Amino acid sequence: MPSVPSEAPASPSPKRVRTRHFQAAKEEGSRFTGLTSYDTLTAQIFDEAGIDFLLVGDSAANTVLGYDTTLPMTVDELIPLTRAVARAAKRAFVVADLPFGSYETGPQEALRTAVRFMKETGAHAVKLEGGERSAEQIRRIVDAGVPVMGHIGFTPQSEHGLGGHLVQGRGQGAEQVVDDAHAVEEAGAFAVVLEMVPADVAQRVTQELRIPTIGVGAGPHVDGQLLVWTDWAGFTTGRVPRFAKQYADLKDVLTEAARMYRDEVGSGVFPGPEHSF
């Protein structure tokens, strides 16, 4: 996203990423990046690294709170995390996830939830799952002046209905992904996440839509990429998603540091004279 500098210029603060910058990036053919973040520490690091947007995802249910799925996550649990990220992000665009059960019953419930996130957290947009089935909710939120990021393909909040973590859009299912993408765009979303969608289907959607597409396991032919940060940083236990390249192994680094601390305390090496008053 060349139109928004990733490093702070001589002025006191860097220029904030806005929805128009994602649209400009699509039109210019420059790809942008997003990461999940759930706290001030990682938000500051990713912001300073030049990541364009930070998603405070309901994936915090797994990565922060220890739930097996995202379904138990509540609005009350997610709001403090979103607030922490928004405080730290000086440049990055902050998106708040709407958790399961906070928007499905209709447009008015969706608007109430979105307004609460915007008023209480400092987020710049909200994200919700679903294509055609969520179009009215998206439209109602957008009409109230709140930017919405859509999310189609594999939608984790619907994993039981989808039969598990399965790629969406294969074979005849491709047309449903395309229809969902157009429904999200027509409802007024400024961008749409395509999760676990075949690369050729994601490419078709990207070519057909005017708004930017964001891939999560959707191949290279999209406008931006999004990853859960614990996946690429080596913190995920068990099977790491195929689409998540591991850029670091921070779990081993922290484990070794904790062991060194334990051993030095046990042996009397720490604290030494230099750590004492």
Curated annotation (Swiss-Prot):
Pathway(s) it belongs to: Cofactor biosynthesis; (R)-pantothenate biosynthesis; (R)-pantoate from 3-methyl-2-oxobutanoate: step 1/2
Gene Ontology BP term (one): pantothenate biosynthetic process
Entry-linked InterPro entries: Pantoate_hydroxy_MeTrfase, Pyrv/PenolPyrv_kinase-like_dom, Pyrv_kinase-like_dom_sf
Catalytic activity entry: 3-methyl-2-oxobutanoate + (6R)-5,10-methylene-5,6,7,8-tetrahydrofolate + H2O = 2-dehydropantoate + (6S)-5,6,7,8-tetrahydrofolate
Coiled-coil annotated spans: none
EC id: 2.1.2.11
EC class name: transferase
Binding annotation for 3-methyl-2-oxobutanoate: D58, S59, D97, K127
Keyword Transferase on entry: yes
Cofactors that this protein relies on: Mg(2+)
Catalytic residues of the enzyme: E195
Residues that, per the record, bind Mg(2+): D58, D97, E129
Keyword set, alphabetical order: Cytoplasm, Magnesium, Metal-binding, Pantothenate biosynthesis, Transferase
Listed GO MF terms: 3-methyl-2-oxobutanoate hydroxymethyltransferase activity; magnesium ion binding
Co-factor binding details: Binds 1 Mg(2+) ion per subunit.
NCBIfam families tied to this protein: panB, PRK00311.1
Subunit structure and binding partners: Homodecamer; pentamer of dimers.
Protein purpose: Catalyzes the reversible reaction in which hydroxymethyl group from 5,10-methylenetetrahydrofolate is transferred onto alpha-ketoisovalerate to form ketopantoate.
Protein family (similarity comment): Belongs to the PanB family.
Name used for this protein in its record: 3-methyl-2-oxobutanoate hydroxymethyltransferase
Biological source species: Leifsonia xyli subsp. xyli (strain CTCB07)
Organismal lineage: Bacteria, Bacillati, Actinomycetota, Actinomycetes, Micrococcales
